[in-house]
């Protein structure tokens, strides 16, 4: 008799390896979990490693509502060289001796790129310009501009400055940095803009995401580890950790299950998605307050 496989549903926090696109990780997880119902929240460039949040089965309903607005990174910025992609994946487009750049100048440049700033995303990115991905336009040699957009860099710190020599013999500086920023911030663009401000050019040579919203690297698993043992955060636990919790009695749970829009307590007004639980602790739905009543965003019960 064939054993029936049951796929656990929940969030999976993956430590993405370098060289994988976010979609590659989703495809790998579909094989590990033996289900097509896998999605991801947020994207990491192929070169980058670190935290990538996946949803399996019913948890895919949570992904679009998770508040993953703040992210943390560790990275290395090379001053003295520019590349087509603003990172080490692209061909070098310019080299300039960076050995005379001082700590004081670097600190001043970092300060200029901290706080609420306007940032022009990297041209080789997934941003659409008139319906076409900017990376496609860039690879076809098209000249175009991407509008600057507001981002918040709440922390940008340099931990070490190392003298180095690039492959073409150019004296360069490698900066070990940490960044805490809002969603939509390009660390590659920070590297590019820091180098430009210092007059020597710059690009990102390494990047590791250590946190996305409440999900940290110490809770992440590699794909090899997940292949050995699929570790998921159950849907109810994930929702309870990510959203305000609203416990309802059995009567209101039945009404909600039947599609009735319940009156919501005032404390949930304007807070966004709220996780609704029945008296037994079962996750029933994600709702948001709309004109005093619960509007369903996703139903689980």
UniProtKB/Swiss-Prot annotation:
Q: What does this protein do?
A: Responsible for synthesis of pseudouridine from uracil-55 in the psi GC loop of transfer RNAs.
Q: Which Pfam families match?
A: TruB_C, TruB_C_2, TruB_N
This protein's superkingdom? Bacteria
Q: What is this protein called?
A: tRNA pseudouridine synthase B
User: Molecular function (GO) terms listed?
Assistant: pseudouridine synthase activity; RNA binding; tRNA pseudouridine(55) synthase activity
GO BP annotations of the record are:
mRNA pseudouridine synthesis; tRNA modification; tRNA pseudouridine synthesis
Isomerase as a keyword of this entry, yes or no, is yes
- Gene3D superfamilies documented for this protein: Pseudouridine synthase, PUA domain
Q: Which family does it belong to?
A: Belongs to the pseudouridine synthase TruB family. Type 1 subfamily.
- List, alphabetically, the HAMAP family matched: TruB_bact
Q: Which PANTHER family does the UniProt record give?
A: PSEUDOURIDYLATE SYNTHASE TRUB1 (PTHR13767:SF2), TRNA-PSEUDOURIDINE SYNTHASE (PTHR13767)
Q: Which gene encodes it?
A: truB
User: Which transformation does this protein catalyse, written as a reaction?
Assistant: uridine(55) in tRNA = pseudouridine(55) in tRNA
Q: Decide whether keyword Metal-binding is in the record.
A: no
Native organism: Streptomyces coelicolor (strain ATCC BAA-471 / A3(2) / M145)
Which of UniProt's keywords are assigned here? Isomerase, tRNA processing
């Amino acid at each position: 008799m064939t054993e029936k496989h049951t796929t656990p549903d929940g969030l999976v926090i993956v430590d993405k390896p370098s060289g994988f696109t976010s979609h590659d990780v989703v495809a790998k997880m579909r094989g590990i979990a033996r289900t097509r119902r896998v999605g991801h929240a947020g994207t990491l460039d192929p070169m980058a490693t670190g935290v990538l949040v996946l949803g399996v089965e019913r948890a895919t309903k949570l992904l679009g509502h998770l508040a993953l607005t703040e992210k943390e990174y560790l990275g290395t910025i090379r001053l003295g060289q520019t590349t087509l992609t603003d990172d080490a994946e692209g061909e070098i487009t310019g080299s300039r001796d960076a050995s005379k750049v001082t700590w004081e100048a670097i600190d001043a440049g970092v300060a200029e790129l901290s706080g609420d700033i306007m940032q022009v995303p990297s041209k080789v990115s997934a941003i659409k310009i008139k319906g076409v991905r900017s990376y496609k336009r860039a690879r076809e040699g098209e000249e175009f501009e991407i509008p600057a957009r507001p981002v918040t860099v709440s922390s940008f710190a340099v931990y070490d400055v190392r003298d180095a020599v690039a492959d073409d013999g150019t004296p360069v500086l490698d900066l070990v940095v940490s960044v805490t920023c809002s969603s939509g911030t390009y660390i590659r663009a920070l590297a590019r803009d820091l180098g430009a401000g210092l007059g020597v050019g710059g690009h990102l040579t390494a990047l590791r995401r250590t946190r996305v919203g409440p999900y940290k690297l110490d809770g992440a698993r590699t794909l090899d580890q997940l292949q050995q043992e699929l570790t998921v955060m159950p849907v109810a636990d994930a929702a309870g950790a990510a959203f305000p919790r609203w416990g309802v009695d059995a009567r209101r749970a039945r009404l909600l299950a039947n599609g009735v829009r319940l009156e919501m307590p005032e404390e949930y007004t304007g807070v966004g998605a709220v996780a609704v639980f029945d008296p037994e602790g079962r996750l029933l739905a994600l709702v948001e307050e709309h004109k005093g009543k619960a509007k369903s965003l996703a139903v689980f019960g």
